[in-house]
Amino acid sequence: MGLCWGSPSDSPPTTTPSSTGNISSVGTFKSSNNTTTTGTSRGSNISSNSGFSVASGEDAYPDGQILPIPNLRIFSLAELRASTRNFRSENVLGEGGFGKVFKGWLEDKTPGKQSNGTVIAVKKLNAESFQGFEEWQCEVNFLGRVSHPNLVKLLGYCLEGEELLLVYEYMQKGSLENHLFRKGSAVQPLSWEIRLKIAIGAAKGLAFLHASEKQVIYRDFKASNILLDGSYNAKISDFGLAKLGPSASQSHITTRVMGTHGYAAPEYVATGHLYVKSDVYGFGVVLAEILTGLHALDPTRPTGQHNLTEWIKPHLSERRKLRSIMDPRLEGKYPFKSAFRVAQLALKCLGPEPKNRPSMKEVVESLELIEAANEKPLERRTTRASPSIRQQQGHYRPQQLSSFRPRQNVSRAH
């Protein structure tokens, strides 16, 4: 499954969640400031020597923090029922392999303070979910210990009987996927400046994971897992497939092939060998989506264009061809020099050999240099797309999927 401290293999724990209505499987600790922190004793132990900590030296990422044990609030099921109005269908934000995600409101009980409460997102396990306790536990163990501006914040959890729930900060603008691929008056096209801002934020989140002392490989980087707050700040979500990276003496780990078609790195799909820079490939795919406004995989496109990266790689290195695949919803309002530099960076990220791809730290630096150039976007211009591109745009039907949709797992296991 995902990243569970102390569990080097993909084998699930042999025990099951307690059904006694208490939280016996989770140890509770009290700190000096009365904040409740949690650690789990089933399947994956949390301790200060778990091997997951911020790296020292120049590679350490200064904007984030890793705690020795999770620092989370324990919610009662009654609290979360009340906050979501008994999990009403109209409060559903999305649905995926784990279950449904509901919008909720927590009352602010501070004396004398007038407030409408805090908006939250509550992920509730579907009893028939194939992911279940292991993924719930991994989210608690991992997100409960990290704090970074570009990682979605886990506020707490609930474990009562068979009920497993996770409580996150609410991300007002939804997922990058919805903004890039959904059509209609309710969806506002993203400007070039916003797209670049989102790319930088997501890159910083990945760079932070890779900079930990025992590198974390995210393993499922895609547009639907990039959530946006009210100011379009990007935060990476859903860490159910994350894994600890290789030791210093190894180049990769070997594991079951899981992820999403169109985003998984070719070496991982072919061999089960997972590199830290396998994440960089996924980032390159998302950069291609940001440039084109097209989904990584779309079987409704003409033959030869189903896989976005395989189709457009030749277009990324040539200026004239790049113009023909740029997202028409940008209406030509983008500095072409910046777009070309982003395309060149995407091409490097999509390199066939992991060792030749840039690190995420280098990706962040490159994107920040592009942003710092501060070129003025061009006024609207008419670009002449090639017939195949124009035909493709006419046939494309965006996949209107939530950020919590079920994963399309690569079928091959290793």
From Swiss-Prot:
GO cellular component: nucleus; plasma membrane
Keyword ATP-binding carried by entry: yes
Lipidation feature positions (N-myristoyl glycine): G2
Recorded GO MF terms: ATP binding; protein serine kinase activity; protein serine/threonine kinase activity
Domain Protein kinase: 87-370
Biased segments, Polar residues type: 21-30, 384-414
Keywords of the record: ATP-binding, Cell membrane, Kinase, Lipoprotein, Membrane, Myristate, Nucleotide-binding, Nucleus, Palmitate, Plant defense, Serine/threonine-protein kinase, Transferase
Annotated EC: 2.7.11.1
GO biological process, one term: defense response
Region (Disordered): 1-54, 375-414
Pfam families: PK_Tyr_Ser-Thr (PF07714)
Principal location class: membrane
Catalytic activity annotation: L-seryl-[protein] + ATP = O-phospho-L-seryl-[protein] + ADP + H(+); L-threonyl-[protein] + ATP = O-phospho-L-threonyl-[protein] + ADP + H(+)
Positions of the catalytic residues: D220
Annotated residues for binding of ATP: L93, G94, E95, G96, G97, F98, G99, K100, V101, K123
Covalent lipidation (S-palmitoyl cysteine), chain numbering: C4
Ranges annotated as biased composition (Low complexity): 31-54
Mode of membrane association: Lipid-anchor
Cell compartment(s), UniProt: Cell membrane; Nucleus
Family matches, as CDD domains: STKc_IRAK
InterPro entries: Kinase-like_dom_sf (IPR011009), Plant_Ser_Thr_Prot_Kinase (IPR050823), Prot_kinase_dom (IPR000719), Protein_kinase_ATP_BS (IPR017441), Ser-Thr/Tyr_kinase_cat_dom (IPR001245), Ser/Thr_kinase_AS (IPR008271)
Similarity remark: Belongs to the protein kinase superfamily. Ser/Thr protein kinase family.
Oligomer and partners: Interacts with the Xanthomonas campestris effector XopAC/AvrAC.
The protein's name in its UniProt record: Probable serine/threonine-protein kinase PIX13
UniProt source species: Arabidopsis thaliana
Name of the gene this protein is made from: PIX13
